[in-house]
Design a protein with these regions (language model features):
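Domain-level signal for soluble alpha/beta catalytic cores
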Residues: 1-385
């Protein structure tokens, strides 16, 4: 945003990217907004890597997710923009086909959210237009952060060449495949390695799922559950942590190695004799120093009923009102206080050894005290620091 002599331009809203701690800038659609294709960056980067001998798969946010995540500030809504957005994606497919792109990936994480009839109608409408007279590069529909229980049957009957499903956070993904099957003329990009956390994959569990899929004669490509941008790049430069902990970690490069090893193991009848399998078995056979049998037992006993919060919201409201005595419209801040220049400066001095850790702790405590006092002085009902 900008506020100054030249004008007042409000910044676009920033929201969390689904259930991650990453954020995105929310596009705003006004009534006079014109939807058109500008893919110069995407096709340019594809051509650049192609000249280097690197075969890539261009990835873009899909049309349905794009429509669902925009903010409509005028009288128009997603349905009004659906045809124009779909036409832009049709043109993108044509451009990629002209560049001899083999696969074009559409990321559609919005499909894992609860979908009502209007959402399903929008999804069908936009892709009906996208696929009208479709020829050219193969389209991969990639989903993540959950399962697509509301539209799985629809998806498998649409002309996608590949479908990416999340087997980590998608609790019903396996069940959906068992119940409705998976088309023999499509490729399943199976998200079997967690793309969001930094832990090693348990090969035994993953290989079992791979065997089940291949027993169904499904054409499977092993993949991560989502983009690897959510994890650090590599373990190679982690020199300060003990190997006792590092051996359990897998960052982006290590997760790619896991995919490669899993692919090799899955092709071998005698995979239990291979070194990669033995190393993984040893890792999970041992006891971690942070293990708690009590916690493991509690987790094993978790059922679907445990995901239902009790008591009901109306009862919780009454209890909270009685306990805290807050007014009907309590005042608070929207979140934590900003990292001011002096806070950043003090942290930098700590890293350089200019101040001691105790001096830094005392400084932070003084800042917290200032924040709390300021909130008390202006009369906020709920304090944060």
């Amino acid at each position: 945003g900008y506020q100054g002599e030249s004008g007042d331009v409000k910044a676009l809203a920033m929201k969390k990217w689904f259930n991650t701690n990453y954020h995105y800038i929310v596009p705003e659609i006004e009534d006079d907004t014109v939807i058109s294709l500008d893919c110069e960056k995407l096709t340019g980067e594809y051509e650049e890597t192609k000249k280097l001998g690197i075969k890539t798969k261009p990835v873009v946010t899909g049309p349905y997710t794009m429509l669902k995540l925009c903010r409509y500030v005028g009288s128009k809504n997603a349905e009004d923009l659906a045809d124009d957005v779909a036409e832009a994606y049709r043109q993108l497919i044509a451009e990629c086909t002209d560049k001899n792109v083999e696969w074009l990936q559409f990321d559609e994480p919005s499909l894992v959210r609860d979908m009502d009839d209007d959402d399903k109608a929008l999804f069908h409408r936009v892709y009906y237009r996208v696929f009208a007279d479709h020829v050219g590069c193969k389209i991969l529909l990639q989903t993540y952060f959950g399962d697509v229980r509301d539209v799985y049957e629809d998806i498998i009957n649409m002309p996608f060449a590949g479908i990416g499903l999340d087997f980590i956070e998608g609790r019903q993904t396996g069940e959906l495949i068992n119940r409705y099957g998976f088309p023999g003329d499509k490729v399943l990009f199976a998200g079997l390695v967690n793309g969001k956390n930094i832990w090693r994959n348990h090969y035994d569990k993953t290989l079992k799922i791979i065997r089940q899929l291949r027993d169904k004669k499904i054409n499977v490509v092993l993949s991560t559950s989502c983009s690897l941008l959510h994890v650090p790049y590599t373990l190679k430069h982690e020199t300060k942590l003990s190997q006792d902990y590092l051996r359990f970690f897998a960052f982006a490069e290590e997760k790619l190695t896991e995919l490669s090893e899993l692919a090799t193991l899955a092709e071998r009848y005698n995979y239990t004799e291979l070194e990669a399998y033995h190393k993984n078995q040893e890792l999970f056979a041992g006891t971690r120093d942070c293990n708690s049998n009590e916690v493991r037992q509690r987790l094993a006993a978790v059922t679907e009923a445990d995901y239902v919060r009790l008591p009901k919201r109306s009862e919780r409201q009454a209890l909270q009102k009685k306990e805290f005595g807050l007014p009907e419209l309590p005042t608070t801040t929207i979140g934590s206080f900003p990292q001011t220049k002096d806070v950043k400066s003090q942290r930098a001095q700590l890293r350089k050894g200019v101040v001691t850790e105790q001096e830094y702790v005392d400084f932070v405590k003084s800042k917290i005290k200032e924040c709390v006092k300021w909130q008390e002085d202006i009369g906020l009902d709920v304090l944060v620091h």
